[in-house]
Structures are given as structure tokens and as C-alpha cells.
Amino acid sequence: MPGSSSRSSLAHLRNRLSECSDLQSLYEVAVLLAISRRLRSSLVSRSLSCVSKQKLIAELTGKDPDAFICMAVSLRWSEPIDLLYAFEEMFIRASCTRRFADCRDFLDELFWVSSIVDSHKILDKTLSARFLPAYSKKQLISGVFAGAHEGTLAVLEYFACYMQKKRAFRECVFFAEKIVADELGAQIADVTTERPLSREQRDELVDVLSRRFKRRIILREVINEKVFGGVRVQVNHSVIDDTVAVHLNNLALSFGALETFS
């Protein structure tokens, strides 16, 4: 969880993102921050003036940063890594509105990517591997996800090549999904069932979850034949598990408790 300074700065950037005039520069600065811990520390340092920070970015990118990027590095950040995550988020949000006619198309493609990665664990391990060179990862992404929008491919290639050590590729895609959903004013609900829900069931579930979480809900349905009856729903860290397996487990625990006191 980011500190209060980072949360405040991030909220400010979200409100001012429309002022960003250069999507490519967001990407370039994110890459620079991803590969250089020293640069991250310098750009959040309070001992370095805003003018010096702007000059540093200009030297590294070969061009003067736009006003939005200057504003981002002038804000206060709790930790250096928070500045990197902020640029990643701004790049994804800006991609939603500037590369896609409909943000939902972006989210649907990310869902498609997730389904492939979840079905092929070796793909996640390969794209998360530190030893694999960037050009090999880019070739793999363009091959596996052929036909994806260039905006989607740009985000996937960025995370595959520049993700931080403690993150995995699938985790980064999930990060992107949450941002795009938020840009749509929604939250994602992962629904795991034994068989596909009917349209009526989906509509009813969306209505119930929307009222519970007080926000628009977008369902991502996962079919798992190992799930016996009922549904399992996860929205962020909240889990609602109404499967038969859970009910049987609770029943078994109840019998165990009774035996303890018998």
C-alpha cells in the first residue's frame, strides 16, 4: 500500500492526465525508471530541484519533457518505486483513451491474454524470466498474442521486458486490468463456476455485486469443472464462495467441533 504522499500525488495525476500531450514520453520515462533505481531515487529526492529533475529527464530522453511529466516528478512520493508505478498507470490510462476507440476493447483483450497465460503456466514463467533477453520476449508476445491491438502489445511488451524483480507477468496483466476497469468506472469480479452462467444469472449477479460494492461490476467468468455446484466470486480481496465444496467443508468442521466437546 503506497504512503499518503504517493496516494495524494497519484490522485492528482489521474485528475490531470488529460493535460499529457505525449503518450510515447510516458512510456519512455517508465522504461528509464524501471531500469534505474538510482534515477527513481533522484527524481523523488527533495534535495534536487524541479529544474534539475527536468534537465535530467531531457538528457536521458533527448527531448524536453512535457508539462505533465514535469509535474509528476515535482510531486512528493513516499517511495521511489511509487513514481515508477505511477508512470506505468498513467501510460495504461492514457493508452485507454488515445489508442482505443472503446476502453472495453482494451479490457477484453487483457482478459483474453490472462486466459491464455492462466492456461499455460510455462508462458507466465518464461515471460517473467530474468535471463530471457527483451527481443526474445517481444518475439514470443507478438507470436502468442498475434492479432492483438498495438496498444495491448505495447503494454505486454513493457511488462515482460521491464517488470520489477518481485513481480510476475500475470501479476502485471492483472495490474493493467484493474487500471483499465477503473478507467471504465468499474471493478472486476472473477466468477468461477462449473458451467457457464445463463444471461439471467449473469445479470442478477452483476446487480447484486453492484449494490454490494456500490460500483459498476464487470464479470470475468472462469469455467472450472473441479468446482462442484454454486459459484466462487472474487472482487479485489473480497471472496464469496458458495460452492458445495465449501459447504461440505464447513459441515465437516462443525462435526469436528461437536466431537471435540462430546
From Swiss-Prot:
Entry keyword annotation includes Membrane? yes
Which Gene Ontology terms cover its molecular function? proton-transporting ATP synthase activity, rotational mechanism
State its location(s). Answer: Cell membrane
Record keywords: ATP synthesis, Cell membrane, CF(1), Hydrogen ion transport, Ion transport, Membrane, Transport
Q: How does it assemble?
A: F-type ATPases have 2 components, F(1) - the catalytic core - and F(0) - the membrane proton channel. F(1) has five subunits: alpha(3), beta(3), gamma(1), delta(1), epsilon(1). F(0) has three main subunits: a(1), b(2) and c(10-14). The alpha and beta chains form an alternating ring which encloses part of the gamma chain. F(1) is attached to F(0) by a central stalk formed by the gamma and epsilon chains, while a peripheral stalk is formed by the delta and b chains.
Protein family per UniProt:
Belongs to the ATPase delta chain family.
Q: What is this protein called?
A: ATP synthase subunit delta
Q: Which gene encodes it?
A: atpH
